[in-house]
Design a protein with these regions (language model features):
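Transmembrane-helix signature of 12-pass secondary carriers
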Residues: 1-465
Length: 465
């Protein structure tokens, strides 16, 4: 059956217009400057998501004295942002299955940018507490929905590198927050960190005119002619108006368009039960460790080791640079090692490093810097790679929902982690903080190694029917 609304490109393929045809055309597209452009545009939003998420870590040391902050209030202020992110991740993930990946991404950017501006206007602890909580809604929703969007444009071969080179912008945003925090907070004041975080409001205004909706999502919703039209436009760009021949279309598994809306229970049916539970553990273990360390280390250097503010921020910057190096290595190697193997090895490397720091005592700031940097090199790569892996293990009909609900465990871990640090430091000493982190990381490695699903080199519709 040939539908009258389909484009000439679709009619020339010889496969009836349907989900399988859209998938086959996406899989035959070579990575091109168009894909890089899409990755960069979405990456700008993700860069500022990371920047805004970590900005609080570099603002807090400047507020300890003026606002008379106790360790308990610091931990609560850090944690409450992640509570907002938890709600935002689930809510915006649900919305992305209803109204689309791109429209939802625009809403998340507008939310976190506007609230960053309000954070800059905070006049006391309570106002910053409220604004930071609300900002978390947008911060929690943007990355998993954007990751689903980028995944749905990627073909099986080289998908790990393609997606992770986009995701790499997140740790770059973390490093940028550290660099700018090191310079801006002592020089201009803490409010400017939040003002910088409001800049992507401009992107929210123009994003829908810069990029199209995901054809995979449109096809899964039965909007085949829209998916065909968008894909034909991209094919024309990639082929330079037909001057460059595209590879032939290969047959793909037949996948029906979704006949009913996805419900939460679908995440726990059939093969997706074990996948969901395993990936939740991976998210929790990686972010409990990484966010617990990155948000608290500037303050720990300031309060326990009595560093002046610039030196405390400098040491924290070095750890983030180590994390950036680890994520870059992951982006280059994960299509070779596979997802499951990388997760197991990185959790083991990070967990053993943290256990070593507990063993030697964590009494010297340079020792803390060394061991924490090695650990961060490994575990921060997992924090990045789960944004690649999670969309791969769910079908299009629930890809954004599954990714967003899984990322909610990031928010749970990030909310609990800083509070655990504050409690453990006060009650049991600094060294035991790293013991807790190390044990959590090792548990994550065992679960990933035993129950992870290998997805490298496989078409999304094959991995998740």
């Amino acid at each position: 059956v040939v539908e009258t609304g389909q484009t000439p490109a679709a009619r020339s393929i010889g496969i009836p217009l349907g989900v399988a045809q859209i998938t086959a055309r996406l899989e035959r597209l070579p990575y091109s400057s168009w894909h890089v452009r899409a990755r960069v545009i979405v990456g700008v939003a993700t860069f500022f998501d990371a920047f805004d998420a970590l900005a609080i870590a570099y603002v807090l040391p400047a507020l300890i004295g003026p606002w008379h902050l106790t360790p308990q209030r610091i931990g609560l202020l850090i944690s409450v942002g992640y509570v907002g992110q938890l709600v935002g991740a689930i809510g915006f993930g649900w919305l992305a299955e209803r109204i689309g990946r791109l429209r939802t991404t625009v809403l998340t950017i507008a939310t976190y940018a506007a609230l960053s501006f309000l954070c800059a206007l905070s006049w006391d602890y309570t106002s910053l507490f409220v604004f930071r909580t609300l900002q978390g809604l947008g911060l929690g929703g943007e990355v998993p929905v954007a990751a689903a969007y980028i995944n749905e444009w990627a073909k099986a071969k080289g998908r790990g590198r393609f997606v992770l080179l986009y995701e790499l912008i997140f740790p770059v945003g973390l490093v940028a927050a550290a660099l700018l925090g090191f310079w801006i907070v002592p020089t201009f004041g803490w409010r400017y960190m939040f003002l910088i975080g409001a800049l992507p409001a401009v992107l929210a205004l123009v994003l829908r005119w810069l990029l199209p909706e995901s054809p995979r999502w449109l096809a899964a919703k039965g909007r085949l002619e829209e998916a065909d039209r968008i894909l034909s436009q991209v094919e024309s760009i990639v082929s330079r108006g037909g001057k460059v021949a595209l590879p032939p279309v290969q047959a793909m598994p037949a996948v029906a368009a979704a006949e009913a809306r996805t419900c939460w229970g679908d995440l726990f049916r059939g093969i997706y039960l074990s996948r969901t539970l395993a990936v939740w553990v991976i998210w929790f273990a990686s972010y409990f460790t990484t966010y617990g360390m990155t948000t608290w280390l500037p303050t720990l250097y300031r309060t326990i080791f009595k560093f002046p503010l610039p030196q405390a921020l400098k040491y924290s910057l070095l750890i983030n640079v180590a994390g950036l190096a680890g994520t870059a290595a992951c982006a280059l190697l994960i299509d070779w090692t596979g997802r499951r193997t990388w997760f197991a090895m990185a959790f083991a490397g990070g967990g053993l490093s943290l256990g070593g720091l507990w063993y030697v005592g964590a009494s010297d700031p340079r020792t803390v810097l060394l061991y924490a940097s090695v650990s961060f090199f490994f575990i921060s790569s997992i924090s990045l790679a789960v944004y690649l892996y999670t969309p791969e293990i769910y079908p299009t009909r629930m890809r954004a929902l599954g990714s967003s609900v899984a990322s909610a465990w990031l928010r749970v871990a990030s909310a609990i982690g800083p509070s655990v640090v504050g409690f453990t430091v006060g009650s049991y000493g600094l060294a035991n903080v790293f013991l807790v982190f190390g044990l959590i990381a090792l548990v994550g490695g065992v679960i990933a190694g035993l129950f992870g699903t290998e997805t490298k080199g496989r078409v999304l519709e094959e991995v998740s029917p």
